[in-house]
Amino acid sequence: MKATILFLFTLLFACHTQAQNIRGQVTDSLTHEPLVGATVTLHRGMETSFLDYAITDTEGRFTFKRSETKGLNINVTYLGYRKKTVPAIGGKQMLVELLPDAITLKEVTIKSGRISLRQDTIKYDLARFASSKDSNVKDILKKLPGIDVDENSGEISYQGKAISHFYVEGMDVTGGSYNQVNENLKADAVESAEIIEHHQPIRSLRNKVPTENIALNLTLKPEARSKWIWNTQAGIGYGDESIYNARLNAIQLAKSKQGLYTYKADHSGKDLTSELQQLTSNDVHQPDDVPSLVNTPTFSMPLDKQRLLDNDTHLLSLNRIYRKDEIKQNRFSFRYLHDEQRRTQGSEETYHYLSDTIHTLDNQDHRVRTELLRVDWDYERNGEESFTRNVLTFQGKRANVLSQMSGDFNLTQRIRTDKIEAENRFNTLYNKENHTWGIRSFLHYTYLPSSLKFGNVSQDIDLHQAYTDNQFYYLRKRNGFGIELTSGINGRLTYLHQGANYQAHRLQLYARPNISLEKNEFRMGFIPNVIWERHPQQGEGKVYFSPLLYIRHRLSSRWSIQASASLQHHSENPEAYYPTPYYRDYRTLVRMKQEIENIQSQSYALYTEYKRPVKEFFWTLALNHFNTQQNFLTHTDYQGKEFVLTSLEHPNRTENYQVRSILSKGFYNWNLKASLEAIYHYGKGLQAGQGIVQLYEMHWTSLKPKVDWTPTHWLSASYQAEISCNRTSSLPVLCDIQQRLSFNIGNDTWNMSLRGEHYQNEISPKQHKNTWLADIGFQYNTGKWRWSANLNNLFNQKEYRYTTYSDVRSYTSWMKMRPREVMVSVQYQW
């Protein structure tokens, strides 16, 4: 009996000893805020060599797995703080507080600089970049060296790469639609911005599976945390008609729960749909593209959308996220959009075929009405031993387009598309010592009925598509050598009905092993993808081999390089072999082959970057080559003012080369940021039209300089330009110049803004068009009130026109602009 009791006691003690994990949090001793990216090393006694190390996460937390803690010390270092050593304590949460201090980095003493670097985290002190003229977070982010914000979409990129995650206090309240934060969160509420390179959002995969993800995390000022911030705004004005806008939003951003609720209405040209765009994608599952057989009219112009958009938009967005503890969180979002647009536009196109030259003329007056509803529920359990996430999404969208056409055609076109989507993403992983395994499952269903009517044509197409991908994941990593295997089965059921039923189903079995070697800052890997594919209705089956080789090497904390080469095989999407003739729009008839083609593509990439964040210097260079080989071309035949697209069997190889470099530099003493992006692109391939197959070549060059300067507290200025030139083998060089210059003058009480734009577009080698635009704004602040008045399009420009090239085609597009408009508005925050 005594022996049994002694055995059980010993077993219990052993289990307790194994559970003595060392956990803790690193914070600032003055502000008590967590320090992200601090280096924590585990030592035995006072030995200089360490047993293990960790980097603190977005909550400042770290964990070591140790069965014995006696005699162990923890050493914590962080840029700008004094180093600290404390005894390791197992079984309970440790708190390590660091004291701010001046530091020395490679013989350079830095004290309270604007940018600091620690491991893979770059921290921007936004107080050193902000001014009273910044109205929201987006305005500050534009000023940060190394970071760029797209003027129209709002997409944020770092060193030329789009960010993959956007956090506020370590949480993603919008599920990737971060424009809602950037447009609605006040600039003075944010304390710092952190760029986290090689970000691994799954804790159980950290230090196991490196990534190229880039995350942006915003840290709020203490007085802005937790409390509700309410903001309301209303404006009225007049141009050719009465215009208005209105906004009401409430924001609460804490560490355990966050909420963002917004209602907006606009009839002044502002594109509210950009706030619904999901700009981050961090899931391994991507469904097959849904065949889209009818073209809904769109537009793309170098101008800001607000100068072109004639809209009546209402947006309601509700976002809420709860963090139950360190690892569990729930997120819910609801979004509704009602958008009506009127667009008056046109184009003159010329097709330069060897056998014929074709000219077309289109004038279009569109009325576009869109209704969208989206609901998301996201549950996540993100622990160090296991990970589980489930995302459920429902979205419904209805679009109705009424178009009046003139030019080559005089007719009315009506398009209606309804799209209903349901999706579920599930991912679970488990860790045990050197092993990781898990299951991923993805389900997606789409129902897409569409209707196209013009003249004597009445076309209705119904589409149902169900897609699933289910995979098993296993990883073993030891001594720098890793074997990662992803294998599974995916299937697609596609039903098309256009008078008769057509099926385009597909089944795949795949294995994707990843054999990697990692030593210090060097990593290389080989991924020999193998896919078996079957199309049952078409009676075709094939085996694809698509290998990928990659190398990544960090030469130093400043310099890194990576290269990759891949060979891919894949089959076409269903619209490429859908046999029933159909109209895409009023002048494009499609008659494709029934054979499924195998497409082979090769890609090669070389990327290098150099950065000195303390010196506010960032530079990248990217070289890319991509080529595609296939046995069919799309042949264009111009018949009776209609374009008829058919499949032509002819070997074709398309090649593309691109060089892209971005240089960004901040000047602390001048409070200035300057950047330059340079791109050269070359492409060649075959184009089939009017019974002839001909070779085309394209050259495109672009230079984009940008400057943001705040010389004093009462003056800020910005300048950006783009100089682009393009030519083809059959067409001469055309160059366009875009320039924007803006000034903000004032103080905390009042502010005046001046903005000028110049567009010089070559319409033809002998004709160019200059467009001058100007805006004036005035703002007065008193307490919680903000009054503003704006005069837009001062010179009352009516139309914008430009020309560009594509393969053997040149096209000149024009679009009606918003007229001269004046607007006054008032804003109140509490």
Description of each model-found segment:
Residues 46-61:
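Short, acidic Ser/Thr/Gly-rich low-complexity loop/linker segments typical of extracellular
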Residues 206-208, 272-278, 342-359, 392, ...:
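Outer-membrane beta-barrel translocator domains and adjoining extracellular loop/strand segments
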Residues 35-36, 63-71, 88:
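Short Pro-Gly-centered beta-turn/loop motif in secreted/extracellular proteins
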Residues 702-830:
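Conserved C-terminal beta-signal and adjacent last beta-strands/turns
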